Regions:
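Short active-site-adjacent helix-start/loop capping segments
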Residues: 46-48, 76-77, 96-97
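N-terminal, post-signal-peptide region of Sec/Tat-exported proteins
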Residues: 29-67
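Conserved beta-propeller blade repeats
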Residues: 23-40, 70-90, 120-127, 133-134, ...
């Protein structure tokens, strides 16, 4: 006879409070020597209203994670091209006239927003006519940054939560790969079809690498 206690099958209820205890893992990159993966684990604190992060390394070949205090010198800056000549960045660029005073210059005090499509707001971010664009520049002081998306009313990094994970150098330093949903107005609001684009820094040409994939392409 096998006697088993029902308590052995008891499981903790997955409550909102339990979810807050789970660590959020974020990969930071490969170490400069290529031997370790560097990542952080952020655990939210309801009482402190913030997340507390701990940093770790783990061998790429497998093994145990080791806690580290600083990661600044462990991971190469991914925004610097592999050949060291260029650096990537992003900034907002005004590409649309949304404010009433921009559309009607004679109404200098107008503070209304004028929209012609459904893309007036993305979650918690209003469309104010400015869009995130990717730039590159020579890796030296006071170098002029070049917009790889000139005059385009699209965002990369993606709004509202995209960051510098939305763009990266190709291994040969000749191209920039970036994530973007190149749709405008109501089409933008009704679609999640982001794509991966490749910008050639020599020819200035942009190629859609995932045109056949009608989905949320990010990697």
């Amino acid at each position: 006879t096998i006697i088993m206690s029902t308590n052995s099958f008891a499981q903790e209820v997955l409550s909102p409070e339990t979810l807050w205890k789970l660590g959020r893992v974020t990969p930071l990159g490969i170490s400069v020597d290529g031997k370790n993966i560097v990542y952080k684990v952020a655990i939210p604190s309801v009482e402190e209203n913030k997340s507390n992060s701990t940093f770790y390394t783990i061998p790429v070949t497998g093994g145990n994670a080791v806690e580290v205090k600083e990661t600044k010198d462990l991971v190469k800056d991914k925004n610097i091209s592999p050949d060291g000549k260029y650096i990537l960045s992003s900034q907002e660029v005004k590409t649309e006239n949304i404010l009433g005073k921009d559309i009607y210059p004679e109404l200098k005090k107008a503070d209304a927003y004028v929209y012609n499509g459904l893309d007036y707001r993305h979650w918690d971010t209003w469309n104010n006519g400015s869009h995130n664009h990717v730039f590159y520049a020579e890796n030296k002081e006071k170098a002029k940054a070049i917009d790889i998306m000139p005059n385009e009313p699209y965002d990369s990094p993606q709004k509202p939560f995209g960051g510098d994970e939305d763009y990266i150098w190709s291994p040969d330093s000749k191209s920039i790969i970036y994530v973007c949903k190149k749709k405008f107005g109501t089409d933008y609001a009704l679609s999640t079809n982001t794509d991966l684009y490749e910008y050639n820094i020599e020819t200035k040409a942009t190629t859609n690498l995932t045109e056949s994939n009608k989905g949320y392409d990010k990697n």
